[in-house]
């Protein structure tokens, strides 16, 4: 590959990195722990903590992903 091609590739990669939106994976998790698993059918209510309102966390219980108020353990 020519030096011009390498510079173009480097420029495109840099631009892609700058323009890539911040994903939820880069955000810190919310404080607290998820409460015990609820007894209910499978439901996918959320994808991550930031898809839940307020202080609620996206809690995964196998086939259940739902927004729940966190519990805090000392």
UniProtKB/Swiss-Prot annotation:
Keyword annotations for this protein? Antibiotic, Antimicrobial, Disulfide bond, Secreted, Signal
| Keyword check for Secreted | yes
Q: Name one GO cellular component term.
A: extracellular region
The answer on whether this UniProt entry bears the keyword Disulfide bond reads yes
Gene Ontology molecular function, alphabetical: serine-type endopeptidase inhibitor activity
UniProt signal peptide:
1-24
Superkingdom, taxonomy of origin: Eukaryota
* Summary of the tissues where the protein is detected: Expressed by the venom gland.
Domain WAP, chain residue ranges per copy:
27-71
Question: What intrachain disulfides are recorded?
Answer: 34-59, 42-63, 46-58, 52-67
Tell me where in or outside the cell this protein is found.
Answer: Secreted
Alphabetized InterPro entries for the sequence: Elafin-like_sf, WAP_dom, WAP_four-disulfide_core
One biological process term in Gene Ontology: innate immune response
Per the record, the similarity remark reads: Belongs to the venom waprin family.
- State its role: Damages membranes of susceptible bacteria. Has no hemolytic activity. Not toxic to mice. Does not inhibit the proteinases elastase and cathepsin G.
What is this protein identified as? Porwaprin-a
């Amino acid at each position: 590959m020519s030096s011009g091609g390498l510079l173009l590739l480097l420029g495109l990669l840099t631009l892609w990195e700058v323009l890539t939106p911040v994903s939820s994976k880069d955000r810190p998790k919310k404080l607290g722990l998820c409460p015990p698993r609820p007894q209910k059918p499978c439901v996918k209510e959320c994808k991550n903590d930031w898809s839940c309102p307020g202080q609620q966390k996206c809690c995964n219980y196998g086939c259940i992903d739902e927004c729940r108020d966190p519990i805090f353990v000392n």
